[in-house]
Amino acid sequence: MRLSLSIIIFLGYLIKPQTGFEIAKMIDEKPVPRSLSNKIEMLMKNSKGKTRKKMIISKSINGGEQQIMWFVKPKTDYGVSFLKIEYEHRHDEMRIWLPNFGKVRRISSKKKGDSFMGSDLSYEDLSNRSLNENEYYRLADDVINNIECYVLDIRPLANLKSSYSKNVCWINKSDLTGIKEESYDKKGKLIKRKFFRYSFLDGYSILTYAYVENIKRNHSTEVFFSDLIINQDVDKKIFNEKYLQTVPFD
């Protein structure tokens, strides 16, 4: 029995491979918690195997669109704090309070490739990737640790100030979480590898671990997220420069 033309067209639509943008859009549309409070431990290791640890208290709303972080350990970093506010149609706002200097420093778009507090994360790495500010190319699917993945080549638009020429991302097909990312500099050279793990809390994918390898520096940073509290009422007033100088009880 022959299928009608309309059915053939419909079935063809269902099995049509998704484009890179369509996959990115599905990721962008995933639900995020209204707020997230947590503690962050950063463990940094240099080329000689020497490690340094930093402890942070973080609060954010709307999937990290607004976030404030206070450093509580080590003692030399106590009181340093960081504020990030993301915008849809203009550059994100980033400020860091440096108590030893008694001033707030604004992180300009030219400085977003700089290291965040000596770690292998840059200020740019701390921002969500805006869907419409990048081009997405779907590469061949891959399998990592028995996890089937989409692979996307993500390139910032020419007018976007980015320290990367592209990021290649491995996306878990089952839950649309990014589990691996490779970042390339402006010359197309691989400079960072990043790996991520998530937990599912009340139906949300929440980042609980990140590993960042800086190939250029032969340096690495592990990031552990703990004491996760979601959808708690968070006063939006704290996402303001004046609250950078007020460290909450840890």
Which residue stretches match the model-derived regions?
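Short, low-complexity, Pro/Ser/Thr/Gly-rich segments in the mature regions of secreted, periplasmic
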Residues: K237-D250
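Short amphipathic beta-strand and strand-loop transition segments with alternating hydrophobic
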Residues: I57-K59, Y137-V143, R197-Y198
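Short solvent-exposed loop/turn micro-motifs enriched in small/polar/acidic residues
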Residues: K50-R52, D77, H89, N134, ...
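Gly/Pro-enriched, hydrophobic low-complexity segments
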Residues: P17, L83, E93, I107, ...
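Hydrophobic h-region of N-terminal signal peptides that target proteins for export
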Residues: I8-P17
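N-terminal mature ectodomain segment of secretory-pathway/periplasmic proteins
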Residues: T19-N100
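Conserved glycine-bearing catalytic or ligand-binding loops at nucleotide- and phosphate-handling centers
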Residues: K103-S109
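Sec-dependent signal peptide recognition
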Residues: M1-I8
